[in-house]
């Protein structure tokens, strides 16, 4: 297994979609995407080598872990490094580099080089020695022996690779093609460090983590850019069944379903949650391990801080919330979109009675609480009275509308 630290835009961004379409592969979803319209098989061959690495510009070239090093240590190092740098802008243009086409900086090169050098030094103790390359200058060979990569320090050259080696006669047409393809997207903010992983030798690299830099002019890290979907509903409405239905059908979309942390056994109920004792929950809550927490019906519920990381990565995050905690949730996630899943009182009563977990008085109390709730004006309402697939397909369509659509032809 090898790791690499790259410049890469968030997966939901237009620049990522354009770059992935150019290469014919999305390294976040780890799947092929359609190449631009009109490309030939020979054109596809020209980008195949770059596609294995995903859309990126190198900061720290691929490295294996040194003995005793761990992926967790790499994550921690990147988080520390990210707090030393603020976001900045990068203006790119199609150009050639050693005979291949690339997007190269017109401005911002010195800031990228500084970031690349810092990444190289910070990760040095975690990287195993790399094999020496051939065909290098004396200085490049010296750098490769010491740092595992020849293009560092004064030899560093920031670029987003577009093709493999080109015949000189083909270069102008490829540069023109790139200028048209990336038109309107050649100024990019550099917002974070992207950790890519090669699971095994020769495998395609995958984007596995984005670590955000400080916001320009601030001492704060970047906050949410994705979309949080806050799902509510009375007991018996079938929330868990509907979320499970949608989860199966939306695999591969830039959308995640957050597990809840709950003080009840893992075997209780139909929800796939993380079971905690009261003491464990209180400890995590006291140490800020939850992005949001609340109490209801004698249980404690929490959403982990990973939710904010997923939002910062530009993902759609679906959480199973509580109507009582909605005001608190809005404070934590101002841009959330609420969804109220419900059913008719008769259906709710029948479902609650069938599961046999509540007494008749408990059922009556739950129905009364549900009847008293008025969804806010910005809340999507979904009625789950009939077959699961009916409301399920409606939910899938609504959630899909919040996901970016991969570019299939340009």
UniProtKB/Swiss-Prot annotation:
Segments of this protein annotated with the region unknown: 1-220
Pfam families membership: DUF1045 (PF06299)
EC number(s) per entry: 2.7.4.23
InterPro entries: DUF1045 (IPR009389), GK/Ca_channel_bsu (IPR008145), P-loop_NTPase (IPR027417), PhnN (IPR012699)
UniProt name for this protein: Ribose 1,5-bisphosphate phosphokinase PhnN
Entry keywords, A to Z: ATP-binding, Nucleotide-binding, Transferase
Reaction catalysis annotation: alpha-D-ribose 1,5-bisphosphate + ATP = 5-phospho-alpha-D-ribose 1-diphosphate + ADP
Family, per entry: In the C-terminal section; belongs to the ribose 1,5-bisphosphokinase family.
Binding site for ATP: 233-240
Gene Ontology molecular function terms on file: ATP binding; ribose 1,5-bisphosphate phosphokinase activity
Pathway in which the depicted protein is active: Metabolic intermediate biosynthesis; 5-phospho-alpha-D-ribose 1-diphosphate biosynthesis; 5-phospho-alpha-D-ribose 1-diphosphate from D-ribose 5-phosphate (route II): step 3/3
Function description: Catalyzes the phosphorylation of ribose 1,5-bisphosphate to 5-phospho-D-ribosyl alpha-1-diphosphate (PRPP).
Region: Ribose 1,5-bisphosphokinase, residue numbers: 221-410
A Gene Ontology biological process term: 5-phosphoribose 1-diphosphate biosynthetic process
């Amino acid at each position: 297994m090898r790791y690499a630290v790259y410049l890469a835009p968030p997966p939901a961004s237009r620049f990522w979609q354009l770059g992935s379409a150019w290469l014919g592969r999305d390294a976040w979803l780890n799947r092929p995407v359609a190449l631009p319209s009109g490309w030939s098989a020979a054109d596809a061959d020209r980008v195949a080598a770059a596609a294995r690495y995903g859309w990126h510009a190198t900061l720290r070239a691929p490295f294996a872990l040194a003995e005793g090093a761990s992926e967790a240590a790499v994550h921690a190092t990147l988080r520390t490094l990210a707090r030393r740098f603020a976001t900045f802008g990068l203006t790119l243009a199609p150009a050639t580099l050693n005979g291949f086409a690339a997007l190269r900086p017109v401005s911002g090169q010195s800031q990228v080089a500084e970031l690349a050098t810092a990444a190289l030094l910070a990760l040095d103790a975690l990287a195993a020695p790399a094999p020496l390359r051939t065909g290098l200058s004396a200085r490049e060979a010296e750098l490769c022996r010491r740092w595992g990569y020849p293009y560092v320090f004064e030899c560093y050259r920031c670029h987003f690779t577009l093709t493999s080696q080109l015949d000189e006669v083909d270069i102008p047409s490829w540069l023109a093609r790139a200028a048209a393809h990336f038109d309107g997207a050649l100024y990019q903010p550099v917002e974070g460090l992207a950790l890519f992983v090669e699971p095994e030798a020769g495998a395609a690299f995958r984007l596995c983590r984005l670590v955000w830099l400080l916001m320009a002019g601030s001492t704060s890290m970047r906050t949410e850019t994705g979309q949080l979907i806050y799902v509510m509903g009375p007991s018996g409405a079938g929330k868990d069944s509907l979320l499970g239905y949608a989860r199966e059908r939306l695999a591969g979309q830039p959308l995640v379903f957050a597990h809840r942390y709950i003080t009840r056994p893992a075997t209780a109920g139909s929800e796939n949650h993380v079971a905690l004792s009261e003491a464990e929950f209180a400890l995590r809550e006291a140490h800020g391990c939850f992005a949001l927490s609340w109490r209801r019906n004698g249980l404690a519920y929490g959403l982990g801080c990973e939710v904010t990381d997923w939002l910062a990565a530009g993902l759609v995050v679906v959480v199973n919330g509580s109507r009582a905690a909605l005001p608190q949730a809005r404070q934590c996630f101002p841009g959330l979109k609420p969804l109220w899943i419900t059913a008719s009182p008769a259906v709710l009563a029948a479902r609650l009675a069938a599961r046999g977990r509540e007494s008749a008085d408990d059922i009556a109390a739950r129905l009364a609480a549900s009847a008293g709730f008025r969804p806010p004006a910005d809340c999507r309402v979904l009625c789950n009275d009939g077959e699961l697939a009916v409301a399920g397909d409606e939910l899938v369509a609504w959630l899909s509308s919040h996901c970016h659509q991969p570019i299939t032809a340009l």
